[in-house]
Amino acid sequence: VTTPETSRLTAETIELDDDPEALFVLSLEQGWGDGAPILPPTDERIARILAATPHPPDHIVGVLPPRNGVCTVELAAVNAAMAGVEPAAFPLVLAALEAISAPEWNAFALTTTTSSVFPMLIANGPSRDALGINYRAGCLGGAAGRGSMTIGRAVSLCLRNVGGQKAGETSRTVFGQPARFGLCFGEWEERSPWPSLSQRRGFRADQDVVTVHGGKGTFPLADVNNDSAEDLAYTIAKSIAFPLNNWYLEPTGATGQLVLCIN
């Protein structure tokens, strides 16, 4: 089936039998898989994803390091299709890739470092539930929301297949971390007494926004003793003051950011 969207596609096409394992095996052999099963990026599925954005397939979203691959909307859609992204979530994938490509985000350092750091996506806005972006129990892993699992994975696949980030080759990460498969979660705006992260950054509450943060993993803090907000705040403050990861280095410790999730 040829559509206006697919008629302008330029990516190489391959033909495989209908066995779903065939594509999985090929992705591992060719090096453009992440070790987990992928969905076939057929013309029909790509067309549905492309229809969710006003940009043409050849629109350049950004240049992704470490090999400075030019990421077009088409290439982003192919990787999103393999990750299982539903069309309505594709604009968030594009927004995340655009943010990562911004020079001030320093994605080259992130994709080549020996550290475990990787893009962590924080979603705000009214579409969190509809897209399956987790922000309640298990939001950092295990809640099984489609948006959380596939949006983060699509960004990871784009960095791998367009940017050329591969562990042991262009990426020198020593241990990596589970979030390198993809990490995307939302803010529980309805329960928070404060303006949302996106509102504090100048966006409206009715806008769907994704913030990209270079995260190095999670550090759980459980408090079962304190009853007052003041005591809890004291425990949190004393805990995050501990120089984890690169925070003991200068100037990283003076300029780095920490994401604190409270529930």
Question: Where are each of the predicted segments found?
Answer:
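Non-transmembrane, aqueous-exposed alpha-helical and coiled segments at domain scale
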Residues: 1-263
